[in-house]
Amino acid sequence: MSAGYLDDKGIVPNSGFQRYSARLKADYQVKPWLKMGGNVSFTHYDSREQDTEGGTSNANIFYASNIMGAIYPMYVRDAQGNIMVDNRGFLRYDYGKPGQDSNGSRNTIPNANPLASYMLDKMKYSGDVVSGKWSADIDIWNGIKAKVNIGVDVNNVRATEMVNPFYGQYSETSGVGGLIGVSSERTFSVNQQYLLTYNKTFNDVHNVDI
């Protein structure tokens, strides 16, 4: 029997992966002619990330830092250069689009701010994975043997997404007012294998293996 725990902090804000796992494995010689075995594992995980943080998405902070010049500000600042705060207590991020919070405009990914997406938007996956493998080895008679393998895998995943209604392309001023989404997925699979073999040596010379 074994158990494990992983808490992997992400390198970007509000991201990370947490996992709990356990495994039980046993073999038992039931009779001289029958051996049985089992291997069962359970995993629960929680993942925090941005739904559109990959590839050339505006929420990909690494992509944005490569294509957007360092002259563009991350935050909206006042005349003294201080980062401004809105009436909700949020830092005001620069979206680089007139009519939105910005110190100016930019052609590169306008109406978006990857850091703001990480701080204000939420995406979480929670999953439970159960995997079981069972086997039986049967010595039937005089070189004839049977083997049975059965495997069951169950995977339950629940995803929750929240895109803030305050800033960005889904803000109230854009006519959307934020997004909320919840989805669930369950997969179940069974794998069965039944084998019958024959192995016999005659006169210490000839061998038959089927």
Protein language model regions, located:
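Surface-exposed loop/interface segments of Gram-negative outer-membrane beta-barrel transport/assembly proteins
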Residues: 11-12, 25-131, 147-210
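Transmembrane beta-barrel architecture of outer membranes
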Residues: 17-23
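An active-site-proximal structural segment forming one wall of the substrate-binding cleft
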Residues: 144
